[in-house]
């Protein structure tokens, strides 16, 4: 019997061992590829995310506070830092979540409903704010609205019913808040709409009992956004935090009215950190 002959059982054992090794390598390679592709997709979508989450170098957002107070915080920040402003946007708007949709009929969550997942998000702006953002006039009558929407059904409708109140769709709009006002709800839902109404106070009063909320946003682009970016954000965070504490009734728990600070530097850093961590895991 020649010495170089391998028994059949030994050969089968080695083949099985090699097969397991190859399968393990294939699985690990697939995992690495999936991770790399995922990280690349996130990085490729970074620009869209930043436009949605942080359209300006520095910003202050308010919940259930007036626009004047929000703007004052930004003015204080600019005075303390000496940053030179190239562009500023200051707006007040409403937003609410859709509980149910039947064609063009919308049901809004009530004020007391908690821990809900909306089918869609709607942001509401006055026609004065629309003109401020676009330079264009709409001249809406009392029962008319203008609409930008990602909802396919709404795009073909002539009217819209919101909690039993009917509105005629005067015209369909382009994305008029892009690069001007953040829409963080894009992360939660892919279906969202922006309404323009003739009088935002009348619209808000017509939505009593619903979960509709009021928000403000003041964002600025500065001459040198990289100058002291982290230090500046820390200062803006401090200013917003102190102002929140001074709001009436804010003692314990999660406040109903509050200010929050944000910066493009911080948002971009979070995305880059997430991509870097994903690549490291891969």
Predicted regions and their residues:
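N-terminal Sec/SRP start-transfer signal
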Residues: 1-29
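Hydrophobic alpha-helical transmembrane segments and immediately flanking/interface helices
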Residues: 32-58
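Short, contiguous, pocket-lining structural segments
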Residues: 3, 34, 66
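Hydrophobic alpha-helical transmembrane segments of multi-pass inner-membrane transport and secretion
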Residues: 18-42, 263-282
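Basic-flanked hydrophobic alpha-helices used for secretion and membrane insertion
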Residues: 50, 56-63, 67-281
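Residue-level marker of positions within ordered structural domains that often coincide
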Residues: 16, 47, 225
